[in-house]
Amino acid sequence: MVFPWRCQSAQRGSWSFLKLWIRTLLCCDLLPHHGTHCWTYHYSERSMNWENARKFCKHNYTDLVAIQNKREIEYLEKTLPKNPTYYWIGIRKIGKTWTWVGTNKTLTKEAENWGTGEPNNKKSKEDCVEIYIKRERDSGKWNDDACHKRKAALCYTASCQPESCNRHGECVETINNNTCICDPGYYGPQCQYVIQCEPLKAPELGTMNCIHPLGDFSFQSQCAFNCSEGSELLGNAKTECGASGNWTYLEPICQVIQCMPLAAPDLGTMECSHPLANFSFTSACTFTCSEETDLIGERKTVCRSSGSWSSPSPICQKTKRSFSKIKEGDYNPLFIPVAVMVTAFSGLAFIIWLARRLKKGKKSQERMDDPY
């Protein structure tokens, strides 16, 4: 037998059971094309034990009924015919725990609907659950009973399908429809949309590499950052788009490596170029000494990626003129011709003096040889 869960389009008024049955078929067959699903209940004409009742429901419909709220209980109580043996429902004790067999979820305290003094587990064999319908006392309530007893099977046909929530959420049957409880990171009536995060950009002086398994800069997207030579990363090197639409970490920045600032030497000057920032990676400084001073050290130094200069700052030292400088190669260019001239004049004077001495000596010898 089949009887309907009321559809939103059903008209008010008294209907015969046949009309209700026809209305149910039309509602559940046509409305899904317009986004509405009906949830119908079914029950067996004959009684059977709990195991066979579940087989009957799964073979012909979806499963034994899973009661979700009081409104459903009220509707079942109002609509189902009285059956002296009552109806099996989809709850069973598994490992001493009452469990919804359709979802394999534990029955919570909030969802319990036991009759007075139930469950009592008489003879320690009452592991299945029936629902009282049109009973004088505790009607609509549950009772634990032995699974071998024979009762009518109370089944349902669900509108939820594996693809109902795009496999990104839990489909929950509701009156005239179903509702999707989306998994983290998804949203929408059928969980068809993915949570988005703000797009990221590569930092200056660096690069960014991202993977987007579900869409650009969306849930589960991951981005990794790297800095170029001569700069260092400030912040986290990796970040991920979370289910809330926020990144796990803020975008990092790449800061250029700094070297110690330099100053011009005493008695000299310094000229520097700074392509990236003052006294930072690739900065270059050139030193010059004033007149009468000598440069001690390298004339040029460059800031390296390690944060150190290629050579220490030079100094300017006053020049000391001496002949020893000639040997060292440090002398004034005018010194050589002057020295040559002095040497030449000195040699010439010596030759003239020597010639005069020889001439005087010759004359003296002649006088001694001639007495008269």
UniProtKB/Swiss-Prot annotation:
GO molecular function ontology, one term from the record: protease binding
Disulfide bond annotation, renumbered to this chain: C57-C155, C128-C147, C128-C160, C160-C171, C165-C180, C182-C191, C197-C241, C227-C254, C259-C303, C289-C316
Propeptide: 29-38
PROSITE patterns linked: C_TYPE_LECTIN_1, C_TYPE_LECTIN_2, EGF_1, EGF_2, EGF_3, SUSHI
Induction remarks: Down-regulated by mitogen stimulation of PBMC and spleen T-cells.
PTM statement from Swiss-Prot or TrEMBL: N-glycosylated.
Gene3D superfamilies listed in its UniProt record: Complement Module, domain 1 (2.10.70.10), Mannose-Binding Protein A, subunit A (3.10.100.10)
Topology, Extracellular side: 39-332
Sushi domain ranges (all copies): 195-256, 257-318
Residues annotated as signal peptide: 1-28
Function: Calcium-dependent lectin that mediates cell adhesion by binding to glycoproteins on neighboring cells. Mediates the adherence of lymphocytes to endothelial cells of high endothelial venules in peripheral lymph nodes. Promotes initial tethering and rolling of leukocytes in endothelia.
Protein name: L-selectin
Gene: Sell
